[in-house]
Amino acid sequence: VQDFDRDGVDVQLRAGGSMRPSLDIQLKATVNLVEAGDGEWRYPLRRRNYDLLRETTVVPRILVILELPKEESSWINVTAEELVIRRCAYWVSLLGHPETKNTDSVTITIKKSNRFDVDAVKSLMEQARRGAIS
C-alpha cells in the first residue's frame, strides 16, 4: 500500500510571473463544522495533520475546510451547464501554532470571514509571494 499523504499536501497552487508564488493546501470536507460563536467554526483535526500544517516550510501551507450539507444527496450537482457544490469553504493557516500534548486530534478554530473564494485566493497568493500567510 502506497502512502500518498506523506506531507499533508493535497493541492498546490502556482501563479505565473517572475516570482511564481506557490501555496500548498490540505483539503478537508465535513458535515460537522461546529459553530463556536464570535464568528468562528471549530473543527477536530488529526494531530498528524495539525503538526504538518504548523511547521515552517518553504512554500506556505493552509488548511481548507469545505462545510457540506448534512444530506449527502445535496453535496454536489453536475450538469452540462454547471457544477454546483453546496455550502462554503473556509481557510486557516496554522503556521506557528503551539505544540500540543493531545495524541489523537486538536480542535482548531477557523474564522467565518476566511471564506475560500476568488478574492481569498488572490490575497493568499500575494501573501505567498511575500513569503508568509497571515
Task: State the predicted function of each range.
Residues 1-7, 12-134:
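Mixed-charge (Asp/Glu-Lys/Arg
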